Amino acid sequence: MFIKFEKVKKLLNMLQSMLEAGVHFGHQSRRWNPKMAPYIYEEKNGIHILDVVQTIGELEKARTAFKSAKNVIFVGTRPAIAPLIEQVATKTGSNYVNTRWVGGLLTNWTTMTMCLEKLGRLDAQLETATPKKGFTKKDILSLTRERERLEKFFGGLRNLKTLPDLVVIVGQPNERNAVLECQKLNIPTITLLDSNCDPTFVSYGIPANDDSARSVAFILDQLTKD
């Protein structure tokens, strides 16, 4: 009896934390994707409210998948979410994309590998690029600008040596290219599913508000916790 009480208490605490983080808030009902109907609890004042009881169950499935993955990319490029993507990737030793998903990042892996190798070479060059080594100020400036250009799009992927075995996506409607490339290559995805998302394009979908930084931070923390 005590064990059951503790489980119920833990569940209630989790639900309370989700509500405080605004995980349950979807979009205006006119902006929804009808495929999300099974995850909608109700419509209130023109806003869809997500069923956070289902969120808990789906989050647990996603957490299991995340723990078994060895090579993960976190994706989320909207300005409000980008810092969270870098933080969670750094915390978990994962790769990330938080500025722009470059088309062909996964499906054109050969070119992608060349870009990462070039970035690595530029890092090494700039560590020793001094006038004493024969580099002019113009040379150093040119190398620096080239590295900054590659860093902007590929800096979070420096440790990516092979195609990922899992991609975590925040903001599905904005990350369509990432979604389609993962689908084409049969790479599993974990996706936060707001009321305007398409659950048929995910391997593990977590019904949750993906616009609020607080909601996203909460879900990512729960997803990656030990």
From Swiss-Prot:
It comes from the Eukaryota. GO terms for cellular component: chloroplast; mitochondrial small ribosomal subunit. GO terms for molecular function: structural constituent of ribosome. CDD domains: RPS2. It is found in: Plastid, Chloroplast. One of its GO terms (biological process) is translation. InterPro entries: Ribosomal_uS2, Ribosomal_uS2_bac/mit/plastid, Ribosomal_uS2_CS, Ribosomal_uS2_flav_dom_sf. Keywords: Chloroplast, Plastid, Ribonucleoprotein, Ribosomal protein. Disulfide bonds: none annotated. Belongs to the universal ribosomal protein uS2 family. NCBIfam families: rpsB_bact. This is Small ribosomal subunit protein uS2c. It comes from Ostreococcus tauri.
